[in-house]
């Protein structure tokens, strides 16, 4: 049988998990393609806050955070009904999660930041922590995507500062400072708003509300750029 196209691996979907698997399959020697049923890529990963929960990740370790595999294990077991998750899956998540982040950091454009004040959902549970397990993507200038920028699914309105025509992106760390009106929030807002206004000509040129991509958009953009470096295509609708 003759095919129009031939690939070793076809990845269906274009969220964080799908694009990460595409990177790994390519790096493992497989000819890879990503297909997305809609006319935009990124899925719910793009609209989300972009956070990734990995205990004992490299970014937390760089800040000498006090955590352990046992604490992570105790926490996961405390928030899941007994027997709901197989022990081997929990062990794999705890042991391989940090390795995945290491691989992406060292072999792609995917970079994260430690969220030192983003607590586990149940921090008082056994093994729970007040922060340093979740990460968010490093912001990135969206114009580096070129025409693919227009195909990136937009962030959820709640993950940006919106007022009339103004739609200004912020990171989770910045959002905590701004929404909580914590010390320094006025200075931060003035800085972000000034950059936003001064960038108006370029934003109008690219047809994008804010070229500074953060949260889920930043994570997807970095994955897409990493696939572009590998000449792996993403076919949309």
Segments the model singles out, each with a brief description of its role:
Residues 1, 15, 105-106:
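Generic cytosolic/nucleocytoplasmic N-terminal low-complexity/intrinsically disordered segments
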Residues 9-34:
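N-terminal Rossmann-like FAD-binding beta1-loop-alpha1 element of flavoenzymes
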Residues 236-237:
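A conserved short coil-to-beta-strand element within the FAD-binding core of flavoproteins
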Residues 37-233:
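Conserved N-terminal/central alpha/beta ligand/cofactor-binding core
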Residues 1-9, 27, 221:
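Extreme N-terminal leader/targeting segments of oxidoreductases
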